[in-house]
Design a protein with these regions (language model features):
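Short phosphate-binding/catalytic loops that engage adenosine nucleotides
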Residues: 93
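Vicinal oxygen chelate
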Residues: 7-16, 44, 62-88, 107-112
Length: 126
């Protein structure tokens, strides 16, 4: 990674930053580290971008309605795909169809968080 430039955070626009941040903090087992009425930040429990770890996720209040499929999404690789999908559904995610069933050998499950932001749960680690 460049010492001159690093990714600080991935930003997700949403209507209710706290609600969406709470979902993702529970889903990823991260913690909320900053919070106000406009934005909420979650971080990995044992590291931060400042320590050269993965970026934070920033949930930013945005009044605009979601229009179409996300241009960027997270792919999650679990130990057990079926168990993880069930756990995420219990947290408030839903399975969605965005055309993935057109592929004969689909190995991922497309889901949406409580505000409809898409993400994928990949097949289990080999």
């Amino acid at each position: 990674m460049s010492e001159n430039l690093r990714i600080q955070c991935i930003t997700i626009d949403c209507h209710d930053p706290l609600r969406v941040a709470q979902f993702w903090a529970a889903a990823l087992d991260w913690q909320i580290t900053e919070q106000d009425e406009i934005e909420v930040v979650i971080e990995l429990l044992d590291g931060s971008p400042e320590q050269g770890r993965i970026p934070d996720i920033l949930f930013l209040k945005n009044p605009d309605k979601k229009a179409g499929k996300n241009r960027l999404h997270l792919d999650l690789r679990p130990l057990d795909q079926a168990a993880e999908v069930a756990r995420l559904e219990a947290l408030g995610a839903i399975k969605i169809e965005i055309g993935q069933s057109e592929y004969e050998e689909t190995t991922w499950v497309v889901m949406a968080d409580p505000e409809g932001n898409e993400f994928c749960v990949l097949r289990a680690r080999a």
